[in-house]
Amino acid sequence: MKNFTLLLCIFIITHFALAQTETNTSFASQMNTMFSPLDKNNVPQGILLDYGMEFTNVPAFNGTLTDSTYTNLTAFKQIYNTLLSSRIRDVTTGFVTPQTFDTNLKYSRTTNVITLGGLYFKYATFIDNATVNGKLTYSGGKFYDKYTNGVWQNPYQERKTFVLAATEKIHKGFNIQVKLPSSIFYSNVLSEVQSIEIDFGNGQGYVTVPFNQIVNVSYTSEGVKTWTYKLNLTSSASLYSRSRIKIEEGLTTIPWSERHGNQN
């Protein structure tokens, strides 16, 4: 009976994986057909959100803080996978395979250190009402570039997305070590990043967090803390992101003399 149950589980998992693969392949095939007439070299960064499979609302994470855009590890992965699937031409800068993404995340973690992962990307979308406004043609289930008097009409809007998130939701102890490994911060415009600052919600304000360096953070109380991330760009602009982490009091070590009294 146990063997049958095991085989059944393996069958279900395999069937689900194959079904998911077939769905992804079918979607990609449809998108390739629909967008095939377009000149892909005109797409900013070679990433078109309208072309990809959207796992989450990427434009919402545009560097402006809102109540609905707190980040976590799941949101980070969903945004990355959406951008990965939105590559309309062969661009590789800032990207790794989903398998490498998970591997990097796994091996970047260190005992007693909270690691952060994130991304900063530029990508494109169709402008609103592009077909109505004469910027794009849609005919026979396909998109076509629009030309007016021989002049190409630009239907694209370049956008930015920035997220950072801790790999843990709960931490025990008031003294924390935090690290942002460069191996799990992805960007197709990394040269635009000047610095990253974090307000850990402990009353100390923003502190600069360099890649691959330990930053010590202290709290005086338990509770859910909001970590606010600030991405400073070389253009002098700043983008923001934030996440939550629950801080719990850790074990308190009592000196031997206090536990057993004065032996003198």
Describe each PLM feature range.
Residues 1-22:
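Bacterial Sec-dependent N-terminal signal peptides
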Residues 20-264:
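Extracellular/lumenal mature domains of secreted and surface-exposed proteins
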